[in-house]
Amino acid sequence: MKLANIKVVGVATLATMCACAFAQEGEIAKWDSRMAIESAVIDTNGVKWIDGKYLPIEGRAFDDVEHFYDRLPANVTTNVNGGVRGMKHHTSGMLFRFKTDSKRINFKWQPYSSVISMHHMPSTGVSGIDVYRWDAKKGRWFHVSTGAVKEAEKRGSLSVSWTPGTPCLVNLPLYNGVREFKLGIETNATVEALPPRKSGINKPVVFYGTSITHGGCASRPGLAFVNRVGRDLDVPVVGLGFSGSGVMEFEMSEHLARIDASCYVLDCLWNMGLSTLGGYAGRNLDENYEPFIRNLRAKRPGVPIVMAEHCDVLCRGPDSTDRFIRALYDKLVAEGWKNLVYLPNTDMYSGDGEGTVDTCHPNDIGMESMSKAFGAAVRKALKLK
């Protein structure tokens, strides 16, 4: 095996958008060309393998992390529930966007956890990757292939023929993390970051919420509604959905506020209750929501915030938690708050039960309708045409 030169142009991470300036690990190649050379190795088949740490990545909002692909910083304290602290290793919402002149692209990755699937969500969604190509004539991303982790090997691999110069997007696993990721290209091929988006939105839309925001239960990563909104609106996203654990602790508002976002989307109601109705310790809307949103607005004044109701499979209208945040929304608007968008659950599901796997979590049909509802709210918040 020998080292090979690699041209990496404009590599950047969303971590540059954090309020605190950290050394950009993903930009090492930009500052030290020797590191870029050493990061690419040619195997016996003539494939040049590049570590994912040197690829243009999005959805990775922090650099002060325990593991490179973590969604939250290493200093998350016990003031945040254990579910979040454990699932911060999941790569939901993370993706690579780049252009290459290689005629074939190869991928291999090692998942963080050996649990690669769930009873109601396949391994392709939990631990797989999705590859998309940009169609310039039609002005949209098209799905090319999905890579899965082999149960026996506990590793994933995928090889795809490619039209040189075509932009590529790779969604990472939803309910698993990545310990190692590598892109394989032809020996003399190059990789370049894509130019700024035509939408004009280059700061991320940050989604914070529950298992549904996390991506449960899409059959593959690209179909999760957060990822669909990103592609459909041509905006970068950060996915901070935490299964059963999106409960709006005050500390989480501090972490979100560190991200230099274009918009925040709050979608936590499924994991929360009301103290007046028995509630749940540490999970009550009437205790957590208002301090959370006020702190977020204080730290990021002027950044639009979307307040979402909880999705209801049967579309029965607002429940007590929805009515609570509607009253809070009206209160904040009366105080003079601007750039605040309210998202009712009216269009999140079709109402016929076809959009869910278990009367709660959306399947791919449900994810499509969710993406349209949330996409419309984000479009309104960002004033996109």
Give the ranges of each region predicted by the language model:
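Short, solvent-exposed loop/turn and secondary-structure capping segments
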Residues: 182-183, 217-221, 276
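N-terminal secretory targeting modules
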Residues: 2-4, 10-13, 20-204, 379-384
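Surface-exposed cleft-lining segments at the edges of enzyme active sites
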Residues: 211-216, 238-244, 271-283
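Alpha-helical cap/lid subdomain in secreted, periplasmic
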Residues: 1, 5-6, 89, 250-385
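Catalytic nucleophile-elbow at a beta strand-turn-alpha helix junction centered on a G-D-S/GDSL motif
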Residues: 202-226
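Intrinsically disordered, low-complexity acidic regions
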Residues: 214, 219, 235-238, 248-251, ...
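Short helix-loop-beta junction
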Residues: 226-239, 330
